[in-house]
Amino acid sequence: MSNNHPRFKHYPQHGDYYRMYPAYRPFVYWINEPSYRSAYVNTDDLGIRWTILPGGSLVDVPALKSHFEQCDIIIGGSTVFGVDASADDKTISSYLSSDDVPCINLGNRGATSYQELLLFMFMQPQFPKIRNIHILSGVNDCSLAAMEGSLIYDGYGGIFGQDQYMTYPYMSNLSVCYDDQSYNRWRMYNAIERRYRDNGFFRSIIRAFLGRAYGNEPLRNLATDKRMSFERKLEQNLKNLSNQFSSWKALAESHGASLRYFLQPCVNWNKKAASIVEAECYGADLKVYPSMADYANPAFHASYSKSVKVHCENAGIPFHDTNAAIDTLGADVDIFTDVCHLTDHGNRLVADFISQKSNA
């Protein structure tokens, strides 16, 4: 994303989110940057975003069992994490928290649904008795399926950037602590990656060099066809989702927790007319990622939400569409900062919707 993107103008806090960098972890592939500190967004040593209670207290996840008898969990991707929230106390998890029962933010930026499930499995020893598990998800699986050349493996799903996550600079984290050479190589990879992301001229040079150096190198170990259609990849994702729901149901029952699935908000998945700022931000993204239009439209939403609801019902999991909380809003209200990230007001609306459905 260019620094000239309108999000930086309308939401200056976005710079702090933009500067965050994922950290490699086995099986989940990455977590949010651990121990990240800034004016708008902060994470703990586990990469979990800070949750702030109504009284102003910070929730210490490793010490949860010492301070609370029970907690709620909300899990998903960057919308749950709270990208573009103006503060840690303006996220959905903080809005859902009470001073007695915190809601822990297990939002992992860029995570697909399998990664969400795995992250919960790794984090669950940290929690006291779990009262509610809220899954707020949906867009990342659709976005991955819409990307040209993305891979969705039968029975395994897929992740964003899986080619680079098997090469540089992320896998180098495995050996970074063992010797100085690995550490220096890791620093070099990260420096190249950041400049490639931020500097168009540098990016063009790297592409030209790689095209000459490796253009004729044969491909190997292709496990699936990269030309698979959006519809076929989406079909694979939905089949995988059904398997995940069975696991989620068993995990929730083992904790004695109430489990609900909430389809997350997305541009054009509701009846809200876009505000001037929303149209400007989404329009800028659409120029760079035209594949967004494949899923960010009313017809796709109607079909996809129906399919997810059926899988939820088959697993015995209540399904709710949070886009209903936005349907009645007009173009005078800013809710989206891009295709699926929310303003503070949007986070509050979604939190109120989740709370209402969970307490019904």
Residue ranges and their predicted role:
Residues I133-S137, S204-D327:
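Conserved, well-ordered alpha-helix/loop/beta-strand core segments that scaffold catalytic motifs
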Residues S38, L241, K309-D321, I335-A360:
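Histidine-centered active-site loop/cap adjacent to the catalytic His
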Residues S94, L118-M121, N243-S246, A250, ...:
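Solvent-exposed, polar/charged alpha-helical surfaces in well-ordered, non-transmembrane soluble domains
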Residues F81-D84, T112-Y114, D141-A146, V267-A273, ...:
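Short catalytic/ligand-binding loop motif for oxyanion handling, primarily in non-cytosolic enzymes
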Residues T51-R109, S113-H134, L342:
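Serine-esterase "nucleophile elbow" of acetyl-processing enzymes
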Residues M1-C71, S86, Q126-K129, A146:
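N-terminal secretory targeting modules
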Residues H5-Y18, Y114-D225, Q264-N268:
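Interaction-surface signature
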